[in-house]
Amino acid sequence: MAAIEVGRVCVKTAGREAGENGVILDIIDKNFVEVVGVNVKNRRCNVSHLEPTENKIELKSDDIEEIKKELESLE
């Protein structure tokens, strides 16, 4: 299991959104990824501030609202 991959559900561990679940949308480089979640804004995040979970979402489209609904169904 690759820890940091597109579609992986993670928990943010730092910042104002700490403790919230998010999904990795894109890998920017070795230090940053783009994350979105129900209570997480669509923005880049340092991978050291993420704790990957065993859950993964299949990203069928780039629609943020669809991704948020799938994430809510996991919680």
Curated annotation (Swiss-Prot):
CDD domains xref list:
KOW_RPL14 (cd06088)
- One Gene Ontology term from the biological process aspect of the record: translation
Q: Does the keyword Ribonucleoprotein apply?
A: yes
**Annotated GO CC locations:** ribonucleoprotein complex; ribosome
**Pfam annotation, one family:** KOW
Q: Which InterPro entries match?
A: KOW, Rib_uL2_dom2, Ribosomal_eL14_arc, Ribosomal_eL14_KOW, Translation_prot_SH3-like_sf
**What is a single molecular function from GO for this protein?**
structural constituent of ribosome
The cross-references to NCBIfam families, in alphabetical order and at most eight, read: PRK04333.1
Q: What is this protein called?
A: Large ribosomal subunit protein eL14
Q: Which organism is it from?
A: Methanothermobacter thermautotrophicus (strain ATCC 29096 / DSM 1053 / JCM 10044 / NBRC 100330 / Delta H)
